[in-house]
Amino acid sequence: MRYLIAAAVLAAGAFVVAPGWAAGAEPPSCASLGGTVEAGQMCQVHVTGPTYMLNMSFPADYPDEQALVDYIAQNRDGFVNVAQGSGTRDQPYQMEATTEQHTAGQPPHNTRSVVLKFFQDLGGSRPTTWYKAFNYNLGTKQPITFDNLFAPGTTPLDSIFPIVQRDLNRQNPLGAVILPSTGLDPSHYQNFAITDDQLIFYFAPGEMLPSFGGPTQAQVPRSAIPPLAV
């Protein structure tokens, strides 16, 4: 099952990861970020400053919520710090995000995927876009990463890479070549979502194709790759 949730987010500065939370500090939450939980259990955060606007929308009921909120809060803090330390300009610094969610399987052996997409305008020559995916096995109550997505000893990228290459080439009119050194590198497949019949991989500009191609995603049928270990 697939459902998309558009989420306007952060307008303002730069992507900087803040240091870890101080000992004894209250961990971040929707409320601590200044947000409210609205329809669909989505946390909505809207903040403006003299040099920026910040709007965030993310699920407030994700089973590994603290990991998701920590990531958002760290990026929010870094963004605000840079925006507040920068001079004013004609347009405010902007960061926007969307949330895409997917589920797969049937309880108790089901999974949930949340993919955050961030757009950031720092006033440079071109904005920045990146993805951050969170996947969770509701049966084992454990996060899912690419490292534990398949059984040990399998080589899933041998099957995944050719499918990703064909799908991305179909989307790219210039037909850019993806080198095997890139296409077979697991570090490029960390952001994914799981559905009943496919894996969806998300790539930042320049990760698989040239930066001018923008962010991309590729759909890989589960029937064409080794079984998932979930």
Model segments located where?
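Hydrophobic helical h-region of N-terminal Sec-dependent signal peptides
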Residues: 6-11, 15
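Compositionally biased intrinsically disordered regions enriched in Thr/Gly
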Residues: 2-6, 19-230
